[in-house]
Regions:
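Catalytic core of tubulin tyrosine ligase-like
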Residues: 156-163
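Oxyanion-binding "anion nests"
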Residues: 164-194
Length: 289
């Protein structure tokens, strides 16, 4: 008896999966439900629900299929909750860490300074990003992929990180120190109140860098991952009348998703640099820059 974890990059592909549990199987405004349980919280009216990593109602499975739309710390946490062999990660000893994962999922990594997290949990978070998140392959956009091995790898790594493994924690500390280099490497140009950044899979996430290396702060970021063909826009702080999710869905349809403060292009589509520039222009115009 085994639990199989599957990644579906689009709603159409996800609809063909007979899943017992779905973990953030959210594709813009489309939510794929599991026959046993659905863990989702990114839809309007669902913001009060816990992120999967903090959802104690997710049942444990002896066998079955778990479906996800993407893999990040919060989604991994939800997947691991379905496995009794990783129940020690959720016994309450590491609640601060999981609260931080929830915070990042809802608010974005750029808000880490407002999370109230301890230095220890911040190092643990960066350790996960450095050792697991950044090592994930780029999954195909046109088919469902078995990710069971990756879930177990993440669980084993988290167990080491949370138990204080020096090698893992050192990688997290080094990642935090890398921020200045990342700022310089991803900077493209300024458009009004928006910083345009270009990254790739190796360089990594950069939507938390609202201040340039010269110390100038901006209201928003538009970032383009040229390997993934993905666009992510985000706001440093809430702006009346500006919703990142609405902008992305207006431009690319309902499968673009996220929150008012941070949102991305449809997971199954490869976006061009021209589309990235147009998105940045739309964001800048709406802000008024």
């Amino acid at each position: 008896m085994t639990v199989q974890f599957l990644h579906a990059p689009s709603a159409d592909l996800a609809k063909g999966v007979d899943a017992h549990i779905t973990i953030e199987a959210e594709y813009g405004s489309v939510v794929i439900e599991g026959s046993v349980y659905t863990a989702a919280h990114h839809q309007a009216g669902m913001e009060h629900l816990p992120a999967p990593c903090n959802d104690s109602d997710i049942p444990t499975l002896d066998e079955g299929v778990v479906l996800v739309s993407h893999l990040d710390l919060d989604t991994f946490g939800g997947c691991l909750r379905t496995l009794g062999s990783f129940s020690d990660l959720f016994d309450g000893s590491f609640q601060g860490f999981w609260n931080l994962a929830h915070f990042v999922d809802v608010n974005g990594a750029h808000k880490l300074g407002q999370s109230g997290a301890t230095e220890g949990d911040l190092n643990r978070l960066h350790s996960f990003w450095a050792s697991v998140q950044n090592a994930l392959p780029r999954f195909p956009r046109d088919r469902v992929v078995d990710i069971t091995d990756y879930v177990h790898i993440a669980g084993d790594a988290l167990r080491k990180i949370l138990s204080g493994d020096v090698e893992y924690l050192t990688s997290g500390i080094q990642m935090r120190e890398y921020a200045k280099t990342l700022n310089t490497a991803t900077f493209e140009r300024i458009k009004g109140d928006v910083i345009l950044r270009v990254t790739d899979d190796k360089t990594g996430f950069c939507n938390h860098l609202y201040t340039t290396t010269s110390g100038e702060a901006y209201k928003a970021i538009a970032a383009y991952n040229k390997d993934a063909g993905s666009i992510t826009i985000s706001l440093a702080d809430a702006i009346d009348g500006v919703s990142c999710r609405t902008i992305m869905q207006d431009l690319f349809g309902p499968e673009a998703g996220g929150h008012d403060g941070i949102a991305g292009s449809p997971r199954e589509q490869f976006m061009t640099y021209h589309q990235f520039e147009s998105t940045a222009d739309s964001l800048s115009e709406l802000i008024g820059g």
